[in-house]
Amino acid sequence: MAAHLISQLRYLGVIPQTEYVEYGFEIEEKDKDPRLIVLMIDPALFKKHDLMFQEAPDLCYQKLLLELRSETADLPVSPRFSVTASDIAHYRELHPTIKSRKIGSRK
């Protein structure tokens, strides 16, 4: 999908579920009805990959942008898809975090 066709990409928020955490986005495109896209993250991935809950919305946003770049009229982005360990690794490469902070240094 050409980025210029999206007039607005809006983050709707977090929706905790029993088996996963959902992150909702709404896409508004010129001359089309708004689309709801939901990305899901298995809660176990947060601990396993040291992913902070505060990072998850941006991770989902970045993954959605990648999906939208490869979208075609014949193959639209799925309205629901999962974030994988591979997606987290890719995000970490582009957004390194400071691991040197110690828990005891917080007041």
Segments the model singles out, each with a brief description of its role:
Residues 1-35:
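Short, charged/polar N-terminal "headpieces" of proteins
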Residues 45-107:
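Acidic, low-complexity intrinsically disordered segments
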Residues 35-48:
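A short, surface-exposed beta-strand/turn
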Residues 5, 14-19, 40, 55, ...:
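Generic detection of intrinsically disordered/low-complexity segments and helix-coil linkers/edges
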